[in-house]
Amino acid sequence: MATSPEHISMALFCDFENVALGVRDANYDKFDIKRVLERLLLKGSIVVKKSYCDWERYKGFKSTMHEANFELIEIPHVRQSGKNSADIRLVVDALDLCYTKSHVNTFVIISGDSDFSPLVSKLRENAKHVIGVGVKNSTSDLLIANCDEFIFYDDLVRESERVAARREARNPRDGQP
């Protein structure tokens, strides 16, 4: 997409449980939304942030997500239909925004779930740029292929570890005043 960063308006939609489980399975400490936001802000402005989950089950993350100004969409955990209602709600909200807010030209789907591939296709059909964010080992190849761009959380973790190591090398603390 040839849009300059000052003209990029992004809407973020986070399937929180999916990404939190992916981070856990990859043996990272815990999902850090700040890493994702720092990378995305290099691309443009973020005008909408929504995160979907049964927040009763993920209470420990609520304050961090609130601090990052996410609207937390409460999706009670009911497994009667077999279909994740967080996924459905996320799709409905993303399409609603696509059709009603023309200034939003970039959609970010934070999930590794292949169920979002039809959403990505529909957004692209409507001339929206789509960025996916997910954990490498728990992200569908189909989702990766459908997005215009995909950011692996694993790369963000490695980058922050490299930055921390460089900082530590410049300012060693072993016994020096």
What are these regions (language model features)?
Residues 86-93, 145-146, 164-170:
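Short, surface-exposed amphipathic charged segments that create phosphate/polyanion-binding patches used
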Residues 133, 163-177:
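N-terminal regulatory modules in eukaryotic regulatory proteins
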Residues 139-164:
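Contiguous mid-protein beta-loop-alpha structural module that forms a pocket-lining wall or clamp
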Residues 1-99, 119-124, 129:
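Domain-level signal for Mg2+-assisted phosphodiester chemistry and nucleotide/NA-binding surfaces
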Residues 72, 107, 130, 150-151:
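Short, well-ordered beta-strand core segments
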Residues 58-62, 135-143:
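Short, glycine/polar-rich helix-capping loops at beta-to-alpha or helix-loop-helix junctions
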Residues 100, 105-111, 115-134:
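Active-site histidine-anchored catalytic micro-motif
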